[in-house]
């Protein structure tokens, strides 16, 4: 269950991601710096954490998506390895072409930091098998550019193929179709704006994020 948490300059949720990974998946999970050109041998899950990589210069995730480690992340995904991108990590995945669409400024142009409710739209992915279809989760968000956009054809394809896995119950940012998280065609790459790593312990107010890691653990064990 080897897990690698990628660190970019400006990442600020990397410690949270590492803690959640060690707590739920891999006690030996570790960091990988963005200048590395290879993942640790045996890596099964790559975790792209939230933050403000490279200070969000140009666009959120734009520079991080072109950092040296991302070639290895792309190759890992192409081999069927699991990739989880949260918040800025989701932005990096879209910029890198691993997921379609883009994340733009929130509808009200304000930074939003609060617990939100999500509905599980697809409980048949490797990331969501621990949930029930339609289950409502409480997971926090913390972003200023979480407004998901894609062209109409892409949105229609995502919906038709069941690749919208999480949807906001009360849309906080203007995302088209209330989209909070999507997977790639193969189903091994998940990008989402809410922070499941901040919802793995009751002490933090919610354990609803644990299902993602439990689902992955089940997939990795198989």
Swiss-Prot record:
The active site is at residues 87, 195, 197. Residues 2-222 form the Glutamine amidotransferase type-1 domain. Pathway: Purine metabolism; IMP biosynthesis via de novo pathway; 5-amino-1-(5-phospho-D-ribosyl)imidazole from N(2)-formyl-N(1)-(5-phospho-D-ribosyl)glycinamide: step 1/2. Keywords: ATP-binding, Cytoplasm, Glutamine amidotransferase, Hydrolase, Ligase, Nucleotide-binding, Purine biosynthesis. One of its GO terms (cellular component) is cytoplasm. GO terms for molecular function: ATP binding; glutaminase activity; phosphoribosylformylglycinamidine synthase activity. Its EC number is 6.3.5.3, 3.5.1.2. One of its GO terms (biological process) is 'de novo' IMP biosynthetic process. It is found in: Cytoplasm. Coiled coil: none annotated. It catalyses: N(2)-formyl-N(1)-(5-phospho-beta-D-ribosyl)glycinamide + L-glutamine + ATP + H2O = 2-formamido-N(1)-(5-O-phospho-beta-D-ribosyl)acetamidine + L-glutamate + ADP + phosphate + H(+); L-glutamine + H2O = L-glutamate + NH4(+). Its main location: cytoplasm. The keyword Plastid does not apply. It comes from the Bacteria. Part of the phosphoribosylformylglycinamidine synthase complex involved in the purines biosynthetic pathway. Catalyzes the ATP-dependent conversion of formylglycinamide ribonucleotide (FGAR) and glutamine to yield formylglycinamidine ribonucleotide (FGAM) and glutamate. The FGAM synthase complex is composed of three subunits. PurQ produces an ammonia molecule by converting glutamine to glutamate. PurL transfers the ammonia molecule to FGAR to form FGAM in an ATP-dependent manner. PANTHER family: PHOSPHORIBOSYLFORMYLGLYCINAMIDINE SYNTHASE SUBUNIT PURQ. Part of the FGAM synthase complex composed of 1 PurL, 1 PurQ and 2 PurS subunits. This is Phosphoribosylformylglycinamidine synthase subunit PurQ. It comes from Deinococcus geothermalis (strain DSM 11300 / CIP 105573 / AG-3a). The lineage of its organism: Bacteria, Thermotogati, Deinococcota, Deinococci, Deinococcales.
């Amino acid at each position: 269950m080897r897990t690698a948490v990628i660190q970019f300059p400006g990442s600020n949720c990397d410690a949270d991601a590492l803690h959640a990974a060690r707590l739920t998946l891999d006690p030996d999970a570790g960091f990988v710096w963005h200048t590395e050109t290879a993942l640790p041998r045996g890596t099964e899950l790559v975790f792209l954490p939230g933050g403000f990589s490279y200070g969000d210069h140009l666009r959120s995730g734009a520079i991080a998506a072109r950092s040296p480690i991302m070639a290895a992340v792309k190759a890992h995904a192409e081999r069927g390895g699991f990739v989880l991108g949260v918040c800025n990590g989701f932005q990096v995945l879209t910029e890198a072409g691993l997921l379609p669409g883009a994340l733009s400024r929130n509808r009200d142009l304000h930074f939003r930091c609060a617990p939100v409710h999500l509905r599980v739209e697809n409980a048949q992915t490797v990331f969501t098998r621990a949930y029930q279809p339609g289950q409502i989760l409480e997971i926090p968000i913390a972003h200023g550019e979480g407004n998901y956009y894609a062209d109409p054809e892409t949105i229609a394809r995502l919906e038709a193929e069941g690749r919208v896995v999480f949807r906001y119950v009360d849309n906080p940012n203007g995302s088209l179709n209330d989209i909070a998280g999507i997977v790639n065609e193969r189903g091994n790459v998940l990008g989402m704006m809410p922070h499941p790593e901040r919802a793995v312990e009751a002490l933090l107010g919610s354990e609803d994020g644990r299902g993602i890691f439990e689902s992955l653990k089940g997939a990795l064990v198989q």
